[in-house]
Amino acid sequence: MTKKKKIRVVTGGVFDILHVGHIHFLKQAKELGDELVVIVAHDKTVEERKGRRPINSMYERAEVLKALKMVDEVVIGEPNCISFEIVKQLNPDIIALGPDQNFDVSALKEELKKKNINAEVIRIPYAYKSDVAKTSKIIQKIVETFCE
């Protein structure tokens, strides 16, 4: 009897101040396959892309994600880039993009093809809409509540 190949889903993000929007996204990503691997953005990447340091370090964010039952593995990304080398090593069947991740899906698919990464790219729609399901909104609310 042959063993059925497990479907590996890979996603990535900052995941700073984990909130309900992250949880809904990760649950949906996990439902796409058997294993969910999360690439946590390197602190330097967060600074470059968001214009601020993350509240929690990449190690703290990774530890929190590892504690979630839907997450099977966590990898910390390379500084200042999206590492296709890490993605290639993880050998995903599916790459799950969050609804607010500003990737050009066509360009991403083309880049994956160039790197010989044969993964389907799926953008997960918002499952939970709320003003507090966004890290920047949570930070803003904290500042307004405790710093004014």
Swiss-Prot record:
InterPro entries: Archaeal_FAD_synthase (IPR050385), Cyt_trans-like (IPR004821), FAD_synth_RibL (IPR024902), Rossmann-like_a/b/a_fold (IPR014729). Gene3D superfamilies: HUPs. It catalyses: FMN + ATP + H(+) = FAD + diphosphate. Its EC number is 2.7.7.2. It comes from Thermococcus sibiricus (strain DSM 12597 / MM 739). One of its GO terms (biological process) is FAD biosynthetic process. Homodimer. Its cofactor is a divalent metal cation. The keyword Cytoplasm does not apply. This is FAD synthase. Catalyzes the transfer of the AMP portion of ATP to flavin mononucleotide (FMN) to produce flavin adenine dinucleotide (FAD) coenzyme. HAMAP family: FAD_synth_arch. Pathway: Cofactor biosynthesis; FAD biosynthesis; FAD from FMN: step 1/1. Belongs to the archaeal FAD synthase family. ATP binds at V14, F15, H19, V20, G21, H22, D100. Keywords: ATP-binding, FAD, Flavoprotein, FMN, Nucleotide-binding, Nucleotidyltransferase, Transferase. One of its GO terms (molecular function) is ATP binding.
